Amino acid sequence: MKTLAAEPAAEELYETASFVYFIRWLWSRCLEPSFGLTTIWKFKLVPRSSSLLAALLVGLCQVSLGQDYDIEVPGQPPGVPVPKGVTLFQNVRIFDGTSPTLTAPSNVLIRGNTIEQISASPITVDANANAQVIAGNGRVLMPGLIDAHWHLFMAATPQPVLMTSEASYLNLLAARQAEATLMGGFTTVRDLGGPVFGLKRAIDEGVMVGPRIYPSGAMISQTSGHGDLRFLFELPRKLGGPLSNSELEGIAAIADSPDEVRLRAREQLRHGASQIKLMVGGGVSSPFNPIESTQFTEPEIRAAVEAAENWGTYVTAHAYMPRAIRQAIAAGVKCIEHGHLIDEPTAKLMADKGIWWSLQPLRYDEGAFQRMSPVSQKKALQVWAGTDKAYKLAKKYKIKTAWGADILFDAGAARRHMTDLSVMAQWYTPAEVLKMATADNGELLALSGIMNPYPGKLGVVKQGAFADLLLVDGDPTANIKLVEDPEKNFMVIMKDGKIYKNTLK
């Protein structure tokens, strides 16, 4: 009998148990008359005896735990790699994410994944540290950008492709979009709908390149709601029946009672959601619900809020109209997505209650408009017409406002991601825009509490904060249009202390 090199970790035992449970399920299914293998065999050639099943399971357990093979069982599963290097930025002016003015020429020392020191005086680094020194030559060092409403799974993928393709293919497209997002200067995104848990893990473990991800998982929607992406031939829904394609992919989760909403919310939390996303009103891209519709009941919304709060986090809700927004606030929702058709009393209510407003600069886009169905075109025109009023109300009542792009199904728009930031100069100064997309968005992300996947300071250049940084050729606090061309103007992109781009070598 061979001995193990190490005791199996709890995570590995759990994975083994899950694997065995899956095999038991598969074994029983293989012997059901309705399953394909039995139909092909035409006879039940494999006896359904408990002794054979037990022998199979014991064998699987032995293989899985390495008891019959010279397999070393590692002590821990792959962890998140923490950079151990040292980087020194010299002679940079700092936009710290909060102050509207740049600092005097300064030096910034990064050790591992953290900003260790900021000083106007020279910083001396131990010669043995093998530090990488980057001469800023007066350029601007600023926090990495944060998009508070992004969809890595859906931003650049056309909707028909999303709804009809294999999950493996869609994951590859999402991984490509993740790298493009980081190379655009976005070191963190709050992903508000889509199966990105595996992608997040791969990025965190250094397998793939991309931003930090605050995942919501599946968008929770009522039947006929904005997140009901089912084809008509998938209706009527049969209780206990198979899930729809969009649910199987993890894009959406349909729920039609407080108990079902609670279950769907808990499922996302089980996957590791940092916040829960509910569809509580009509949307533009969904053809079967009016933009004016109010979705879910207050008890249904409250069920999600309770599930999230029990996990130390919060619910954010998609809504455009005052009635839907008010119902969500009454049920305990902490953040409203969109809200472009809000009225003034509801805006004041948001300010009074301290509700976050995740608002996007949605505006007329000829290319996007022509690709829409007539139903969506009509709704888009309504929303676009409300954008200016929404931002003016947000400023008037000093509502806590987050910035995000919410680009969907449009590869061209995804490539122009940064223009959704520069266009904000219609309502805010460049420094205010940058603060919104860095420190303010970082404050919103912190609402995820104990479900925060990256507990630490984000969106600021301050001692002790995560080293998520951009070195910009020019002053974006004076000229916000610099962000429109990250390939040209972002000389260095650093995330978690690791340099992903450096054109100053």
Locate predicted features:
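Bacterial N-terminal signal peptides that target proteins for export
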Residues: I23-L53
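Bacterial N-terminal signal peptides
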Residues: S50-Q62
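C-terminal cap of metal-dependent C-N hydrolases
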Residues: V92, M451-N452, K457-K505
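His/Asp/Glu-enriched, well-ordered alpha-helical/loop segment
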Residues: N310, A385-P476
